[in-house]
Swiss-Prot record:
Inducing or repressing factors: Expressed in the late phase of the viral replicative cycle.
Family: Belongs to the poxviridae poly(A) polymerase catalytic subunit family. Highly divergent.
Protein name: Putative poly(A) polymerase catalytic subunit
One MF term in the entry's GO annotations: ATP binding
Coiled coil: none
Any single GO BP term: mRNA processing
Organism: African swine fever virus (isolate Pig/Kenya/KEN-50/1950) (ASFV)
Entries under InterPro entries matching the protein: PolyA_pol_cat_su
Enzyme class per UniProt: transferase
Described function: Polymerase that creates the 3'-poly(A) tail of mRNA's.
Higher taxonomy: Viruses, Varidnaviria, Bamfordvirae, Nucleocytoviricota, Pokkesviricetes
Transmembrane domains' residue ranges: none
Length: 475
């Protein structure tokens, strides 16, 4: 029986050929050049895959083949007006079917010409935009890979986000490859920071919260140490923090005693409904912080405990010891990056703990390799699937049948309610959480003869309050 001839399945190669042979290829390339000049003129900051690719070009590497059409994703502190302005510019230069529309991601506007997307503009509050680190590639500002790491960790933290193309299926592999390239070419230097610790004791409900922050680091470190002793590996010499903890629990609560840095003595927990937990624990809410982009959710602070809200999302978690719930290492890494961005005075401390968490994962991987050699494939898979050190799809469940309600889903539901004029039943879980769609940016099509919309306000829509601002509450 004759065999089929070997075929070259170089997908990127044929994608480039297909792009060049498109009927409107010349028009698209011309439009992208207009976009490029617009980005340079407005000093906008590229992010996403193109920013990673350009940063890698500076190191002699890449993630995209040479000559691939750029996919311009950019941050702007005034993204709605900038999107409208770019649409007007393209229309004035003779491009057809120009428009700008709201993207699925609510803080993003998409600009198209001839039904081809040529730019995505995403909102970044000016207090963040003016301070984030950047690099320059061919006169274009690109977000620094240190900041880009946060977006890559984020996908691993919420595996069921963005249905029906959940991140676990659509992003895990791609983002892991990109992260490894960033770590290879732009590692964060290890700069030891000496910390003074104090022994703190907290009593918390263990079934509905995940331990986070510096306490989670302590639990993960000691879990690693126990795994090391099980594998009979000599103790490692390390400059990274080695905090200890102890606990006891009953049917409802866990009493946790843990070494905490004196600079950050508050316990951090992640939970689906922080206000309900705070009320049940008899605590007094003292401060509320708005989200910091996508990298930190709303934070509800009490005197000794800070609650990170995971409402509408399913957070990946790990289980250690006697079914104690801790956040996944990826969420912990994201927390330390967020701390470095949001609190410049303690940037060195947070980056030291970030590298310490990476070290934990590196050592855990070496121990898992030992276990794999000593056990059957079935036994190893069972062990690895319960390990707190690997990527996981185990999530912190909410009290509803479904937990993942993205802003896009809630906006779509609000549109349906408005068009049908049939309000949701008061008993519906989302009845009090539908956004006011009249406060969202309007789509704009310059060729239709209508004036550019002018009534959008960032302040009037909570979905755009993502600058991390904290508000103290009256006692």
């Amino acid at each position: 029986m004759s065999s089929l001839p070997k075929t070259d399945f170089n997908v990127p190669k044929y994608q480039l050929i297909a792009q060049k042979r498109e009927a409107n290829a010349a028009e698209i390339e011309a439009a992208l050049e207009v976009v490029r000049e617009f980005i340079i003129k407005k000093k906008l900051i590229l992010y996403g895959g193109i920013a990673i690719d350009y940063a890698l070009h500076l190191k002699g590497s890449s993630i995209y083949p040479e000559g691939e059409r750029p996919d311009f994703d950019m941050f702007s502190p005034n993204h709605v007006e900038d999107a409208y302005e770019l649409a007007d510019l393209l229309y004035e230069k003779g491009f057809k079917q120009v428009g700008t529309v709201r993207a699925i991601h609510v803080q993003t506007m998409r600009v198209r010409t001839d039904f081809v997307w040529v730019a995505d503009l995403s909102y970044m509050p000016s207090n963040i935009f003016d301070t984030i680190p950047t690099l320059t590639y061919k006169n274009l500002k690109i977000i620094h890979p240190d900041y880009q790491r946060a977006g890559l960790h984020l996908a691993f933290c919420f595996p069921f986000d963005n249905p029906p193309r959940e991140d676990v299926f659509s992003r895990f592999k791609k983002d892991l490859q990109r992260y490894n390239l960033i770590e290879k070419y732009y590692p964060i230097p290890v700069v030891p920071v000496k910390s003074t610790y104090e022994n703190k004791t907290f009593s918390i409900p263990f079934k509905r919260v995940a331990i986070h922050g510096f306490a989670a680091y302590a639990l993960l470190y000691q879990t690693l140490n126990e795994l090391r002793m099980t594998c009979k590996v000599p103790e490692w010499k390390t400059e990274f923090p080695q905090p200890s903890y102890s606990y006891h629990k009953n049917d409802k609560n866990i009493t946790l005693t843990v070494d905490m840095p004196k600079a950050y003595p508050s316990l951090v927990l992640a939970t689906y409904n922080p206000e309900e937990i705070i009320k049940e624990m008899g605590l007094h809410l003292t401060e509320i912080c708005e989200p910091y982009m996508d990298y930190s959710p709303p934070i509800f602070k009490t005197k000794d405990i800070h609650f990170f809200s995971t409402m509408f999302k399913e957070l990946a978690i790990s289980m250690i010891q006697d079914n104690i719930i801790v956040v996944s290492p990826q969420y912990l890494l994201l927390y330390f990056l967020y701390g470095a961005f949001a609190t410049p005075a303690d940037k060195a401390l947070f980056l030291f703990y970030y590298n310490a968490t990476l070290w934990i994962l590196e050592k855990a991987d070496s121990l898992l390799n030992i276990i794999q050699k000593q056990t059957s494939p079935e036994e190893f898979m069972k062990f690895a699937n319960t390990s707190p050190f690997v990527l996981t799809t185990r999530v912190l469940r909410c009290s509803q049948d479904r937990c993942t309600f993205s802003p896009a889903y809630r906006i779509s539901l609000a549109n349906d309610v408005q068009q049908s004029q049939l309000p949701l039943p008061k008993t519906h879980f989302l009845s009090n959480f539908l956004p006011d769609i009249s406060t969202l940016p309007y789509n704009y099509y310059p060729g239709k003869g209508k004036d550019r919309p002018t009534n959008f306000s960032y302040e009037k829509n909570l979905l755009f309050n993502i600058g991390g601002k904290c508000t103290q509450l009256a006692m």
